[in-house]
Each structure stands twice: as C-alpha cells, then as structure tokens.
C-alpha cells in the first residue's frame, strides 16, 4: 500500500494525459452526450466501497459549481430504491474494475428508465464501459491494495475534469 500511495502523482499524470491542455479540457468519451448531461435536472452517482466515497466528493464538487442536485447511493441500494429516474436524469456509475455486480445492476436500471448513463472506471472494455452511454477511463493502472488509493485519486480527478470541461463547453 505504501508503494501505491507514492504512485498517486503518476496516477494523476496518467489520468490527465491527453485530456488537459493549457487552453482546454478534452473528454472525448463524453462529448456525444454532453448536451444531455448539461440539460439534466438531477444526477445520481452510484458505486460501491471506495468508489462510493469518491462519489461523495463528486457530489460536493458538482453541487458547488452547478444548480443540479446530486444524490449518491450505494449501488446495492440504488437498484432496489424507488429513485426518480427519467430521460432528464444522469446516472454516473463509478467502479474501479468496471465489473462490480451491484454497480452493473444499477446501470441496467438507469438504462431501463431512459437515463443518460456515464461510467468512470479503470478497465477499458469492462462491462461498465460497454453498458453505459458514455464515460471516461481513469488509467490508474493495476492496484494491489484493498484501499484502492490510486483508483480513488483518479476517480476524483475525473469528476473534477468534468467540471473543468463544463466551463470549457460554456466558453464555446
């Protein structure tokens, strides 16, 4: 775990690579759905474990800089709750592996109700990447520690990049 804590600087650099320029933020994985994301009237962030905690920070960031209410739910509860989901809803699924069963079930529920689904995960080609409408890979690399330190740092970085992208999109 000590090694992974010290790898966080490289993790952020890898997460930023090709996405952050002095004059712009580039999030190609979201561009096709960005208008729908910005027009949404509510956002749900669903995840498990450490990814859920990243979602809590995402909620604070998004609500501070937008007028959109954000709700963070454990994926295991999201799939059974009577949450208000429709085509004006964005559901962000966060998963380190992209294969967390409860998170995938939450994505399926959101898709069934017509929400725009966005994935944040580390593994290209994972189920979360395939089942969501759009998304961003964290590029944090393999992580051995249970604490998921690098994934947490990368997930928060991606959520912050989304806010920067919003301000870039508003400038156009």
Where are these regions (language model features)?
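Anionic-ligand anchoring segments at beta-strand to alpha-helix junctions in alpha/beta enzyme folds, i.e.
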Residues: 11-26, 36-91, 118
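Terminal amphipathic helices with adjacent charged low-complexity linkers/tails
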Residues: 1, 155, 159-161
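Flexible, glycine/charged-enriched surface loops at secondary-structure junctions
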Residues: 2, 22-27, 128
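Intein/HINT protein-splicing elements and their conserved insertion hotspots or analogous self-processing inserts
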Residues: 1-9, 13-14
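Conserved small/polar residues in nucleotide/adenosyl-binding loops
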Residues: 165-172
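Hydrophobic residues within alpha-helices
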Residues: 5, 57-58, 106
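Phosphate/diphosphate-binding loops
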Residues: 91, 95-130, 134-150, 156
């Amino acid at each position: 775990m000590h090694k992974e804590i010290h790898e966080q600087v490289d993790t952020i650099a890898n997460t930023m690579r090709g996405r952050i320029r002095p004059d712009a933020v580039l999030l190609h994985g979201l561009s096709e759905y960005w208008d729908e994301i910005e027009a949404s009237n509510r956002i749900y962030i669903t995840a498990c474990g450490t990814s859920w905690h990243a979602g809590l920070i995402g909620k604070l960031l998004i609500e501070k800089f937008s007028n959109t209410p954000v709700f963070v739910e454990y994926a295991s509860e999201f799939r059974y709750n009577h949450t208000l989901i429709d085509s004006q809803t964005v559901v962000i699924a966060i998963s380190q592996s992209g294969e967390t069963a409860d998170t995938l079930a939450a994505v399926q529920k959101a898709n069934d109700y017509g929400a725009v689904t966005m994935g944040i995960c580390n593994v290209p080609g994972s189920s979360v990447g395939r089942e969501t409408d759009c998304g961003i890979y964290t590029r944090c690399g393999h992580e051995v520690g249970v604490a998921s330190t690098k994934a947490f740092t990368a997930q928060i970085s991606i959520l912050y990049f989304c806010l920067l992208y919003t301000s870039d999109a508003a400038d156009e």
